[in-house]
Amino acid sequence: VTPQHPPLGQRLADALPELSPQETRAAEFMRDHLADLAVYNASEVARLSGVSKATISRLYRRLGFDDAEQVRDHVRALRSTGAPIAGEPPAGFSAHLARESDNLRAAFADLDLSVIAPLIAGARRIVVIGFRNSYPVALHLRQQMAQARDAVTLAPLPGQSLGEELAALGPDDVVVIIGFRRRPSSFERVVAAAAATGASVVLMGDDSVRRSAPSAAYLIVCPVDAVTAFDSYGAAFSVVSALAAAVLGESLASGRARIAAIGDVYDGLDELERF
């Protein structure tokens, strides 16, 4: 997608004022079912929108596509980048639950924390990095691991750059970088810079993060595919919970002592609600 080749939704919006009534009917159907166009052929779009196949073929050409296959490829490419594709949500939640279940199974099928957990538990310092949609996942991981051990920081904080966080790292440290799709353009440079410090780099993201994996020592892949317009991070947060629990399990005695000490401070400051 470029300014010269905008996404399908924008092409439809731009073209609507100039379309014939039949083309408008088809275009409005396409606009409301963008995600489904990844699988529909021209005959299906024609039938579902109540127009002729010739109308659909003509509309595709007006939108800059040669045929339905190009439209399908375009929509699939958009979805693979994580770009939201607006459309009517599926009726009920069965498809959503099925996809969430598939994501969880895929995330845990190849998950091996037997090396990563002790590595994190024994590190001098942990820096957890996340950008954009990955930031909440990074924040949650930092909060969970901070219950189990000290010296766990999150970066970048608002108004903060990464340089000061990375400059102090060395071979005894671990950097956990969360990088789900729609990452900033500097992402691969960040991974390489973290690895250049000598720290062990654990990289977590969807399958597309593999292109950044050469600089990382360890890779955790979590699918974020969804049947709705937006990516789902349910599997990612579940893996975060499992990872934090595994880190705690590596140093149970000290972890329990830290949790108890944190609880005492909570009580002293009256920070948490009571039941």
Language model regions located:
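HTH-adjacent hinge/linker in prokaryotic transcriptional regulators
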Residues: P3-V115
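Residue-level recognition of alpha-helical structural elements
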Residues: F93, D112, S134, A195, ...
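Glycine-rich phosphate-binding loops that contact phosphosugars or nucleotide phosphates
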Residues: A121-V239, A244-L248
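Internal, active-site/partner-interface "lid" segment
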Residues: E250-F275
